């Protein structure tokens, strides 16, 4: 019999750290995602845990392995 309990969200060991292997994005998803502002391709910055749109100058965060593709959630890149 297996234990089907889920880890507690309050348990720090159960939450992946930013940029950790558990927060990587599926490469197939990266192939189809585009910047919602420019419709241009994105560059995956694994160290920062972000998808970069150079044309728009925006960095979209990745939270819990899910890209947040909302311009209002993106970080403006320095010029």
UniProtKB/Swiss-Prot annotation:
Q: Which InterPro entries match?
A: Trm112-like
Q: Which residues form a coiled coil?
A: none
Give the start-end ranges of region Disordered.
1-22
Span-the-membrane segments of this chain are none
Q: Which domain of life is it from?
A: Bacteria
Per the record, its GO cellular-component terms are: cytosol
Sorted alphabetically, which SUPFAM superfamilies does this protein's record hold?
Trm112p-like
Q: Which family does it belong to?
A: Belongs to the UPF0434 family.
* Annotated protein name in UniProt: UPF0434 protein GbCGDNIH1_0252
List the source organism. Answer: Granulibacter bethesdensis (strain ATCC BAA-1260 / CGDNIH1)
């Amino acid at each position: 019999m297996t234990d089907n309990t889920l880890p507690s969200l309050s348990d720090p060991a159960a939450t992946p750290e930013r940029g950790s292997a558990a927060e990587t994005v599926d490469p197939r998803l990266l192939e189809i995602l585009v910047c919602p502002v420019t419709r241009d391709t994105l560059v995956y910055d694994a160290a920062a845990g972000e998808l970069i749109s150079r044309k728009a100058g925006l960095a979209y965060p990745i939270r819990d392995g899910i890209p947040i593709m909302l311009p209002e959630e993106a970080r403006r890149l320095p010029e």
